[in-house]
Regions:
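Boundary detector for helix-to-coil junctions that initiate low-complexity/charged tails
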Residues: 67-71
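Primarily marks secretory-pathway-exposed extracellular/lumenal segments that are disulfide-
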Residues: 74-75
């Protein structure tokens, strides 16, 4: 139980702080406590408290504990203290008892997280109780509060001064295997009185042993295929994927977001990063076999037939799968729902999750009833009212059965994912989730808590290797000022919920916590966006770089006769007659008012999918974005240089002097101006968010990275993402796996990229350079990535210094010609440049076949072992 006493400490010298506290002996025999700094009654600083301080006390009301602690900052190796290690990778499932208490006791505590359950920490020193410097007779320490270790020795039998060291002890072999990497520790006589125990804590222990490194597999849940799945991967399949990870000695399984994305019940809902709830899971991930069989054998036989048909498809048929699964949900709910909803297990789940479960269920019901997820268009309940929602959810309401089915589905999804989580933890595998940076503007959160979001803008990403026009995710941005006022409670709840199922997570687009790329609602592409928050430039500041400010020329699309033919070819005259009009300036045009935004152009071409229409539409998009500066969203008299404009015609229209001035301005704005500012923004949010749970934090730090990102992630011990074909150093074409930082996750490809085999065939000149410079081969590169080449690339990544090497399932399988997919193009999961991409890739063989693919599995096992992972 937590100690609820708050007591002030006092100091005489400004360094050492003391207090005396009288407490009752707690029922469970332990006291939790922590230290905070207060000013004017408010907490202004809290020590690192992911692992609370625990003192196990004797059942003796006269006992005095003298505690010597030091303030705890975030440990340098904080990642080893996360639940990924303490609950899974290096878990101690059978803990020893609390140390025996003595009349005069010396309790020594130390932190040592990198010790597996076959070993323990021990104390060896110049006393008989500590082995008289014989490490094999050292005093074994208790792991009751692992990764903190503790032992109490009888101070009455100690002849001070005390000298000691920590040793690593092998419990099976009953011998010490390593001394700590530290000089002898020394303690003068602390004058311990009768009925007193001196507790000395905050020792950190390090050994000169090889650094822990692990490997893992990344695969979307929807991509899993087993003999039992129903045309899409489910949480039952996730357990089977964990079994494969165990069989190949991998330590992590990484998945994509699994939240409900249902808006239209069409394939466009397949995009996993635009959910309608940050809590609810997608119903399609339910393992129907775990829900039970229908009593109607004829109907059940029909579903079994459909299961085989859908499961035989090479890719996910999103609409057919979800339609069929929902038919099953309705039937099984009618058969089992009343009993399940009356169970104690469900009631406990409901009470713990009611805050999000009830609004989600009502939102889903109203979405289908009103045939739109856009709650602003609902004839009733468009504005969230808790009392009205509560009335709808009453069991005697006519709407209740339509709402309660969502309770039933979410409860079963919770049980199934939790079972997969527990299966992973029991087998020493970390389940790594994915937290999208955004939410959908048509979501439960936008409906229920609109004050947290800026719904008049669109989140996205500036141009990068994934997309030359930037990315427009269409998601609202966060109102961080409002979130800050309640201590980021919205995010805290989100992280706490995720920690129920995951021991590690990837922050999708971690840059969003520094700044987000916000695109105006009238834009389709990402080029017209601006960073938020940002420091826009005044007219005077722009001119201070030597660039005379010309408002009409800099802020309006530059459309000149000479390049229209280059863009539109045979359609040039049609474009002139329909979409643009001449100005008073010779050979200069402007957009007609009915087509002067990208959204207006998009609306005009809606439903037109022929090549000519797309050619003209994309050309018009390019014309509209051909501006030198973008007005600030809050102050139209301040400006942001348009991202990537050096590739456009308006930049070419500048003279050499103007180009040089603009380049100086552009470089200062995008690479220097905001470093401290954005770093401060991130440090307002990320420390308390990343430390609100004990999950291992990994950041997706790809794209246009300001310098402040590296130092913030380093200060907060967040693992970076390293990808060889997207090096952090812009002067390098490829990253060097030997140079990767230890605090990182390395991979060959992400879900937003082509696989290793796909990339090999995209740009043969680049592939040739990689073949010669990075792999060290002479001569011409093969036209395709052979299994031997793929194995070489995989091995290089396994040899990297990164603490985790997590490869896509496709890249693992690329090493075996027998088992890899014969069709390389089928393996790509997402194409970021296409906002309407269909997310439907499925592994081409079943998990049962994968488990029996011994040539591949043995190769993976041996490579992992030989590379020390």
């Amino acid at each position: 139980r937590q100690m609820c006493i708050r007591d002030s400490l006092h100091t005489v010298d400004g360094i050492h702080w003391t207090a005396e506290v009288d407490i009752q002996i707690p029922g469970n025999g332990s006291v939790e406590y922590s230290y905070h700094i207060y000013r004017d009654g408010r907490t202004i600083r809290t020590e690192w408290n992911s692992l609370p301080r625990i003192l196990h006390v004797a059942d003796n009301p006269k006992k005095v504990y003298r505690i010597e602690d030091c303030w705890k900052n975030l440990p340098e190796q904080q990642y080893f203290y996360t639940s990924a290690f303490t609950e899974s990778l290096l878990a101690h499932r059978e803990r020893s008892a609390a140390p025996k208490s003595y009349k005069k006791g010396l309790l020594i505590k130390a932190y040592a997280p990198c010790i597996d359950s076959d070993h323990c920490l021990a104390l060896c020193g110049n006393q008989k109780a500590l082995g008289d410097w014989n490490p094999d007779k050292a005093a074994l320490m208790s792991d009751i509060d692992f990764p903190e270790w503790q032992v109490e020795v009888d101070a009455g039998k100690i002849s001070f001064p005390l000298e000691y060291k920590f040793v690593l002890y092998n419990k099976k072999e009953r011998r010490a295997v390593a001394w700590e990497n530290n000089p002898n520790r020394y303690m003068a006589d602390p004058q311990i009185a009768a009925n007193e125990t001196l507790a000395v804590g905050d020792r950190y222990v390090y050994f000169n042993l090889p650094a822990w490194k692990g490997s893992g597999v990344a695969v979307p849940v929807f991509s899993l295929r087993s003999e039992k799945s129903f045309g899409v991967g489910d949480f039952g399949d996730l357990k089977r994927m964990i079994d494969w990870a165990v069989a190949t000695n991998q330590k992590a399984v990484q998945i994509l977001p699994i939240n409900d994305t249902t808006m239209t019940h069409t394939w466009t809902d397949s995009y996993p990063y635009s959910s309608i709830s940050i809590y609810a899971f997608h119903p399609m991930y339910a393992d129907l076999k775990q829900l039970g069989s229908l009593k109607d054998k004829k109907v059940m036989a029909e579903f079994n037939k459909r299961q085989k048909e859908l499961n035989a498809l090479p890719a996910v048929d999103y609409e057919a799968v979800n339609k069929t699964k929902w038919e099953y949900f309705h039937l099984i709910f009618k058969q089992e729902g009343e009993k399940v909803l009356a169970s104690d297990a469900f009631r406990n789940f409901y009470e713990a999750n009611k805050e999000w479960l009830q609004p989600y269920a009502v939102f889903s019901y109203l979405r289908d009833a009103y045939k739109t997820p856009n709650f602003r268009e609902w004839p009733k309940y468009a504005t969230y009212d808790a009392k009205e929602i509560e009335t709808l959810c009453r069991p005697d309401s006519a709407d209740y059965p339509h709402i309660a089915i969502y309770y039933y589905i979410q409860f079963n999804l919770h049980l199934q994912l939790l079972a997969a989580t527990e299966h992973a933890r029991a087998n020493g595998v970390v389940l790594k989730g994915d937290i999208p940076i955004g939410i959908s503007r048509n979501s439960v959160e936008a409906w229920k808590e609109p004050h947290y979001f800026n719904l008049n803008g669109q989140a996205g990403a500036p141009p990068d290797d994934f997309s030359v026009n930037g990315q427009n995710w269409g998601l609202p941005t966060y109102n961080w000022d409002v979130m800050e006022k309640d201590g980021y409670a919205w995010w805290m709840k989100r992280f706490h919920k995720m920690a129920e199922y995951f021991d590690a997570y990837r922050i999708d687009h971690i840059l969003g916590f520094f700044r987000i790329w916000e695109i105006p609602m009238h834009a389709v592409h990402g080029l017209l966006g601006q960073f938020v928050p940002a420091l826009p430039m005044t007219r005077e500041e722009i001119e201070s770089y030597g660039l005379a400010f010309r408002e009409d020329f800099f802020l309006k699309p530059y459309i000149h006769e000479y390049f229209l033919g280059q863009i539109f070819g045979p359609h040039t005259d049609y474009v002139k007659q329909t979409f643009i009009e001449p100005t008073d300036t010779w050979e200069i045009y402007r957009m007609r008012p009915e087509f002067d935004t990208q959204r207006k152009v998009e609306a005009y071409f809606a439903g037109k999918t022929d090549d000519d229409s797309i050619w003209i539409r994309d050309g018009l998009y390019a014309l509209i974005s051909d501006v030198l500066f973008v007005p600030d969203r809050n102050n139209p008299h301040e400006y942001h240089p348009r991202i990537g404009v050096q590739h456009d015609y308006i930049y070419r229209a500048l003279n050499d002097w103007e180009k040089a001035a603009f380049n100086r301005l552009y470089d200062q704005y995008y690479y220097h101006r905001h470093n401290d500012f954005w770093g401060q923004q991130a440090m307002k949010k990320l420390p308390q968010l990343t430390q609100s749970t004990r999950m291992l934090v990994c950041g997706e730090d790809l794209g246009m990275i300001p310098d402040c990102v590296a130092w913030v992630m380093n200060d907060l011990r967040i693992l970076s993402l390293e990808i060889q074909r997207m090096p952090k150093d812009p002067k390098q074409e490829f990253g060097h796996t030997d140079w990767y930082p230890y605090r990182s996750v390395c991979t060959i490809s992400t879900h937003d990229m082509s696989t290793l085999r796909g990339w090999w065939e995209e740009d043969f000149q680049q592939t040739q350079r990689y073949y010669n410079t990075m792999l060290g081969h002479y001569g011409a590169a093969p036209a395709t990535a052979t299994p031997e080449l793929c194995e070489e690339v995989v091995r290089n990544h396994l040899h990297s210094n990164s603490i985790l090497c997590i490869l896509s399932l496709q890249d693992w399988m690329s090493m075996d010609g027998k088992w890899r997919n014969p069709n390389v193009q089928e393996e790509r999961i997402n194409i970021p440049a296409n906002p309407r991409h269909y997310w439907r890739w499925r592994m081409h063989l079943t998990l049962e076949q994968l488990m029996k693919a011994e040539s591949l599995n043995e190769k993976i096992r041996s490579m992992i072992e030989s590379t020390g992972r």
